[in-house]
UniProtKB/Swiss-Prot annotation:
Pfam families: Spindle_Spc25 (PF08234). This is Probable kinetochore protein SPC25. Keywords: Cell cycle, Cell division, Centromere, Chromosome, Coiled coil, Kinetochore, Mitosis, Nucleus. One of its GO terms (cellular component) is Ndc80 complex. Acts as a component of the essential kinetochore-associated NDC80 complex, which is required for chromosome segregation and spindle checkpoint activity. InterPro entries: Spc25 (IPR045143), Spc25_C (IPR013255). It is found in: Nucleus; Chromosome, Centromere, Kinetochore. Belongs to the SPC25 family. Component of the NDC80 complex, which consists of NDC80, NUF2, SPC24 and SPC25.
Length: 231
């Protein structure tokens, strides 16, 4: 049955099915992003616990060295004849203690840096995910029209990558497809691979314009036109 002969109910059911498929695709993408964030946090917690265990061991070693130092000093007091040898041992223990204290400071600095890096990454992923979801909700009606009438397919190809595939672009070959990847894992959107390949200056222009206006429909129209010109 052609679109013109469909009843309003049939058209509604068809549109509803497309909307459900579209929502499922992006629910999957967002779920993968959340899973990546959770995995990063878990890895961070494991690393922090390992470093804390190392710190505890170093503190225990330091206390042990302090006890040894006390014993050495007592021996020096009791045996003056062995003063020089015992003093060398004390000096060596002091150097080891300083070295362990330095290692402790370095480990604490590493813990702080790791915490900061994980927090920055988490914030960036959450911000990107929220921005992407909000923009998709805003552009959803127009994206449905593209998917229904212009042969658009949107594929999730990674935890931070989407692939836009266009068909119905060549009247001589209706099955011919062109596509473009979009990286959405950072604060700014990045254009990935495409077919046919886009020139580097065109990719830079696309990224700058899209990150400025943040309108998916406008971006898709531009990409489709550029790829069609390369056929």
């Amino acid at each position: 049955m052609s679109t013109a002969n469909k009843s309003p109910i049939d058209e509604f059911e068809s549109l509803q099915s497309l909307m459900n498929d579209f929502s499922a695709k992006f629910d999957t993408a967002l779920t993968q992003k959340r899973s990546a964030i959770i995995n990063d946090k878990q890895l961070h917690y494991v690393k922090v616990n390992e470093l804390k265990n190392q710190e505890t061991q170093l503190q225990s070693d330091i206390e042990g060295l302090k006890q040894k130092e006390i014993k050495v000093k007592d021996t020096i007091k009791r045996t003056m004849e062995d003063l020089q040898m015992q003093q060398l041992k004390v000096d060596e223990l002091a150097r080891k203690q300083d070295s362990l204290l330095d290692e402790k400071d370095e480990l604490q600095t590493e813990i702080d840096n790791l915490s900061s890096q994980v927090q920055t990454t988490t914030d960036s992923l959450e911000k990107s995910s929220n921005n992407l979801a909000e923009q998709l909700r805003k552009d959803y009606p127009e994206l449905l029209k593209y998917e229904q009438h212009l042969g658009l397919k949107i594929e999730v190809i990674g935890q931070d990558s989407l692939k836009f595939v266009f068909s119905n672009i060549d009247p001589n070959d209706l099955d011919k497809e062109v596509w473009c990847e979009l990286l959405v894992g950072g604060e700014l959107f990045k254009v990935g691979d495409s077919f046919p390949p886009l020139a580097p200056d065109i990719i830079t222009l696309l990224e700058n314009e899209f990150n400025h206006h943040r309108e998916f429909v406008k971006f898709l129209k531009t990409v489709r036109a550029l790829l069609m010109d390369l056929i």
